[in-house]
């Protein structure tokens, strides 16, 4: 294994917990980049651009592999952000009731030695049950998903909202596609197993 410091360019506790599943040492740094979408920027382009920007903004002096990730939720062709408060969360979930939404998660690994970045993405579909306002309010009051795209925590009670999930890697839904990440790290000579 090459002697790289693994860096997660994120302050998200959810992404940190996901990376901890791999049982490899890493440090977390806060990325410094503008996350404003460009006018008419497609969701896939946005998440890949932001994943690269996050990874390259957290480069450190010693040889490192820096992981950047970004995610958006799309419903009816529109990007849905984090709700940030109770009323917005309720409204988002009401709009999603009975529908399928898609999560696009961009992933980048920046190699500070070669100055090269590999970038990719994964998608995940969430099909919601038909939910009434009372069910949604009870859920929001219990989990307070105010800082989660789509207004739910799939790793918690959010699972109660779903009819089915479609995707290759359930970690993608939480914000870090581990299957793709393992492939990218191995290409850089960083073995997990």
From Swiss-Prot:
GO molecular function, one term: nucleoside triphosphate diphosphatase activity
Key words, A-Z: Cytoplasm, Hydrolase, Nucleotide metabolism
Places the protein is found: Cytoplasm
EC number from the UniProt entry: 3.6.1.-
Reaction(s) this enzyme catalyzes, per UniProt: N(7)-methyl-GTP + H2O = N(7)-methyl-GMP + diphosphate + H(+)
Main location: cytoplasm
Active site: 70
InterPro entries named in the record: ITPase-like_fam, Maf-like
Class of enzymatic activity (EC top level): hydrolase
Residues annotated as site: Important for substrate specificity: 14, 71, 155
Superkingdom of this protein's organism: Bacteria
GO cellular component, one term: cytoplasm
GO biological process terms held by the UniProt record: nucleotide metabolic process
Cofactor dependence: a divalent metal cation
Function field: Nucleoside triphosphate pyrophosphatase that hydrolyzes 7-methyl-GTP (m(7)GTP). May have a dual role in cell division arrest and in preventing the incorporation of modified nucleotides into cellular nucleic acids.
Family under the similarity heading: Belongs to the Maf family. YceF subfamily.
Protein name listed in UniProt: 7-methyl-GTP pyrophosphatase
